[in-house]
Amino acid sequence: MLASLIIYRVNYLSNMLLCWRVRRSSMKNGSYFRSQFAGPRLCAGVLIVLALFGASGCSRFVKRDVAVPSLLSPLVEADTNQLLEEVNRLAQVRSLRGKIDVQFLDNSFAKCGIAERYRTAEGDVILERPGHVYLVIQAPFVGTKIAEMASDGERFQVAVYQGDEKYRRFVRGTNSANYKRLEGSAALDADCDENGKKKTAMAQQRQVGALSGLRPQHFTDALLVPAVAASNANLIYAKSEAFVEELDERPRAKRGARVVRGFYVLDELQSEGEARARLLRRLWFDRFGGIRLARLQNFDERGQLITDVVYRNSQKFGEEGNYTLPASIELTRPQDRYSLRVTYQMPGEVRVDRDWPPETFTLENKTSLQEVDLDKE
């Protein structure tokens, strides 16, 4: 504003000087009486134009209030060792058993610009390190079994009880093996007809198909955070920071308000010699008011994202509340094109660090479902 006014004043004085020179020149040329009216008219016109220009120029510098996302603060500082300690704090939990809500999100139609969210189901989960899991998923209210899955850390079994015949089966496999997606799982090639909308009748089949593609070890690694081995000479940790704009979900936030959240990003790299390294994991730590593991990403040998886990809503777990853990976990498998959201119903009632017999994590085909052994396919 001040700069615009200065420019305006300078132009005004310059043109006054110009008008004076015009009149003086006219007097010298003997045309004073012809110019005594033309000169002032010229000067007045120039000054009016300058006044309008100055006014419009000033308007461009008028202060306006613009809403911008505010940074969530305070931001807590931490070094790499403190970030590793936060991960290993979560990794101290040996076992969990609790009631959960499970919701699937089928991303098969992502190329159509949509994703289908299935109805929430109820579940009971038992998790134990290393890699032990038993999960039963039931329909709400009626308690009908939709699926069961188990793993003893080396082999897994998945039983699907609902849906069409091609979905109902008993699947066996090895945790460390990579398998092709089974026929009948959520579709790989989406049909984008009808503006990308699928028929409602397909919803249950899609849900069961997503269950068929779920592997117990993916579930275990998401809910029981693996520890980090800071003493491993082959691992390199690189810390950086990131700022992400998001919807303000605080209780008193205005509708539609947005904020900026600060993160530390810790890359876990494996040295491969000759000045090369492979990215194994990327860990995101929320810095607002404390240090909290907020996201965990895993990558394969080609650098492709294979697992993306988001952690929210930290709560006290167990009767004694000795552990503060995320009560909401969202697991995304981009290559398998599905997401799974798990929410603990009552974190305070979750059994923590109990010992479970080995048979807990083995599933038998008691209902004579069609068996599929992935190691023999």
List each model region and its residues:
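Gly/Pro-enriched, hydrophobic low-complexity segments
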Residues: 58-59, 212, 228-230, 235-367, ...
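Hydrophobic lipid-interacting interfaces of membrane-associated proteins
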Residues: 101-107, 140-142, 154, 158-164, ...
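N-terminal leader/targeting segments and the immediate start of mature chains
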Residues: 58-119, 203-213, 375-377
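Long, hydrophobic/aromatic-enriched structural stretches that serve as scaffold segments
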Residues: 56, 64, 108-149
